[in-house]
Regions:
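Bacterial N-terminal signal peptides that target proteins for export
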Residues: 5-15
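Disordered, low-complexity tails and leader-like regions
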Residues: 1-7, 52, 194
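Acidic, polar-rich low-complexity tracts and alpha-helical solenoid repeat scaffolds
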Residues: 27-272
Length: 272
């Protein structure tokens, strides 16, 4: 009986090991199934991304708290604009968020094509599905966090390259493309590459901005116009951006700057 019991235990462990291997294989990034997409989206979101986003938020709050405002001139719309344009080396307080983004992409990216359905070439949705470059539905968040972390590290050139890649990588998702292009325009504005920033903003406006991105567009364009001292043109975009801004501190900053713009235009009745 002891021999039989030992054999049964071995068989049980073998079955468990087989199930674990089967589960791992079914959720491998080399397989593109509903199960593998769910598994890798879940793990990238609630494990790696969560830790990176927590670090990102803490670094951003610390940056905001540490910024000393100067009221002798027109204030900056965003404190990041006070950073030097010619930073000698990359890196900074947002490195951990970048590290976590890279880790999530490395471990959980699914680039394998899904099984093709009969007649897929004649179905626009199925054709677009097959043409995607990334099938983990959550990784777009990781890519965007990476670019934003580089941006807040004041590595604007590096961040602009990341956002440019995101726009190409997620060409099938117009909202992600618009968000990435708007961040890219912010990078160009911070580097004072105003022609490049204007080109992106103009093309977005011409091609049509997804409804979800309209408020972001207003904020980015308002900042661009103020940097170019086009104060009158900036006012309507400021009003839209202020209404949409959820962060109380940033909303107060934008209201104060709008008041300064009114004062600059001798509209003191609107300034206060």
């Amino acid at each position: 009986f002891k021999v039989l019991e030992g054999e049964m235990k071995k068989g049980f462990y073998y079955i468990i090991a087989l199930l674990i291997v089967s589960l791992f294989w079914s959720c491998s990034t080399k397989k593109n199934t509903k199960a593998s997409r769910f598994y890798h989206a879940f793990n990238s979101r609630y494990n790696i991304y969560f830790n990176g986003k927590t670090s990102f938020d803490e670094a951003l709050l610390s940056m905001q708290n540490g910024y000393k405002e100067s009221y002798s001139d027109m204030i900056l719309m965003y404190p990041i604009s006070a950073q030097p344009k010619d930073k000698p080396e990359t890196g900074g307080p947002f490195d951990r968020a970048i590290e976590k983004s890279n880790k999530a992409i490395k471990l959980h990216s699914i680039k394998a094509k899904p099984p093709k359905k009969p007649g897929w070439r004649n179905d626009p949705k199925q054709r677009a599905w097959q043409e995607q470059e990334e099938y983990n539905p959550f990784l777009k968040k990781c890519w965007l966090m990476m670019g934003q972390a580089q941006f807040y590290n004041a590595d604007f050139l590096q961040a602009s390259a990341t956002f440019s890649y995101i726009a190409r990588h997620y060409a099938h998702d117009e909202e992600v493309v618009a968000e990435a292009r708007l961040w890219q325009a912010r990078c160009y504005s911070e580097m004072e590459w105003f022609y490049e920033a204007e080109d992106i903003l103009g093309k977005l406006n011409t091609n049509g901005i997804p409804r979800k991105n309209l408020n972001q567009y207003a904020a980015v364009y308002a900042d661009y116009l103020v940097k170019n001292k086009q104060y009158e043109e900036a006012v309507p975009y400021f009003k839209t951006a202020i209404k949409a801004e959820k962060n109380r501190r940033q909303r107060t900053r934008m209201k104060y700057l709008l008041g300064q713009i009114y004062a600059e235009q001798d509209q003191n009745g609107l300034a206060y």
